[in-house]
Amino acid sequence: MLYFSSDYMEGCHPNILRRLSEINMDKNPGYGTDAICESAKNKIRAACGKPDAEVYFLVGGTQTNAVVIKSLLRSYEGVVAAATGHVAVHEAGAI
């Protein structure tokens, strides 16, 4: 069965867990300012074909959903989601 209530209910993909264990002891200056985030920004720019694009990382799904919804939807538009979807259950009133 597929569950859409929250991504916190599932474990991560084995490849992600493996990579996290490889870099677990690396020291980084802070979220968004390290070499891994800089590499990710460049990959996102390349995938979008926008080498000069500004790329920002947000710390959570609620903040990310709020930014995207505010940016893309007009005041009279809404989000269609599964009744058990995170945006419908855990973010009600937050966005």
Feature locations, PLM:
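N-terminal amphipathic/basic leader segments beginning at the initiator methionine
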Residues: 1-19
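Structural motif
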Residues: 2, 54-56, 77-79
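Conserved N-terminal alpha-helix of the aminotransferase class I/II PLP-enzyme fold
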Residues: 13-61, 83-89
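Buried hydrophobic packing segments
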Residues: 64-72
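Conserved PLP-anchoring active-site segment centered on the Schiff-base-forming lysine
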Residues: 71-89
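Active-site-proximal loop->helix
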Residues: 90-94
